[in-house]
Design a protein with these regions (language model features):
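Exposed, low-structure sequence patches enriched in small/polar residues
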Residues: 10-12, 25-320
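Hydrophobic, small-residue-rich alpha-helical packing segments that form membrane-like cores
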Residues: 1-24
Length: 320
């Protein structure tokens, strides 16, 4: 028998600052954010810097956003899907307002672009979107978009995430797609949203997506929603043709003007996972909140598991 002594030196902390700007005429708003992570053995390139600036009047909206994520940035509690990149986004929209007797409130073109670069300035991901939106007077809306996607895989990637085979790192993939979305008027007790897209996919494949969300409000305390999503993917062998469902239910409870409780429970057929998210919110002062959030995921439904986290977040609004 040999006695051993162990020490737990694993930790992860994040410290940051956020500045929000709103102009007196409400035409301009922006944000600057800096976050630094602290973990054992990490001393440099472990921070995030991000900022955005938006101009919005009755007709024109323009927005630019940039972010930098260091190679060693780590957020054990939170979500940072990738590191080691620069990102630059642009959004433009112009609205026309027809005559008073029209059922359409506004309509107009929109443009969006997002670009990722590595630290050598080489483009690794690029997405471009061109579309047209229609907003009706009953507050329902419809959007038609065309998208072009370019991706350089930074790591091996399984396009259907079932473990059959992975595409190689640094391979390039391009495709186009068309997307149509409709949201019903939000003031109704019964609401719904529909979205469908068709186009290319990795490895010169094809993908068709359908999403639907239906909800009903029991005024003024409860809102229940059901979500259904289906993905149909066609690829060459060995992947072949596959279809995957994503099913979920949401519930939102309003106990008082300042206390809220929401839940999301869903099953992801592609990853064979049950996911549960529960969030309690207390607005203790205007624009100031306390959030308590529980997340878990498991391969079996309604079973205790070790893959869960509990997060406490406190926001305090200061007027300067």
């Amino acid at each position: 028998h040999e006695d051993t002594k162990t020490t737990n030196e694993e930790y992860n902390r994040n410290l940051g600052l956020e500045y929000n700007y709103f102009s007196a005429d409400n035409l301009w708003n922006g944000k600057l954010m800096y976050l630094k992570s602290f973990s054992p053995g990490s001393t440099d390139d472990d921070a995030i810097f991000a900022g955005n600036l938006t101009y919005n009047d009755n007709n024109f909206l323009g927005r630019v956003q940039t972010e930098y994520v260091g190679e060693n940035y780590n957020a054990e509690v939170g979500y940072a899907p990738r590191t080691h990149y620069y990102k630059f986004d642009t959004s433009l929209r112009y609205l026309f307002f027809p005559s008073q007797d029209s059922k359409i409130l506004s309509h107009g073109p929109l443009f969006g672009s997002n670009q990722y670069f590595n630290f050598d300035g080489v483009g690794i991901d690029r997405g471009t979107q061109l579309g047209y939106e229609v907003n009706f007077k009953n507050r329902s809306e419809m959007v038609l978009t065309f998208e072009n996607q370019f991706i350089v895989l930074q790591n091996p990637f399984d396009p259907i995430r079932t473990g059959i085979q992975s595409l190689g790192a640094l391979t390039e993939h391009r495709w186009n797609s068309i997307n149509l979305a409709y949201d019903s008027k939000p003031q109704s007790l019964f609401t719904y949203a529909l979205e469908s897209s068709y186009g290319g996919y990795f490895q010169d494949g094809k993908r068709w997506l359908f999403f639907s969300e239906m909800g009903y409000r029991f005024q003024p305390y409860v809102e229940l929603n059901a979500l259904v999503s289906y993905s149909h993917i066609e690829l060459e062998e060995p992947w072949g043709t596959n279809g995957f469902w994503l099913l979920g239910v949401k519930s939102n409870f309003t106990f008082t003007r300042n206390i809220f409780y929401s839940n999301l429970y869903q099953y992801n057929e592609q990853q064979k996972l049950w996911n549960f998210n529960s969030r309690f919110q207390w607005r203790y002062k205007p624009a100031s909140d306390i959030f308590l959030v529980f997340n878990s995921s498991d391969t079996r439904m309604l079973t205790p598991n070790r893959n869960w986290n509990l997060t406490l977040k406190i926001n305090f609004w200061i007027n300067l």
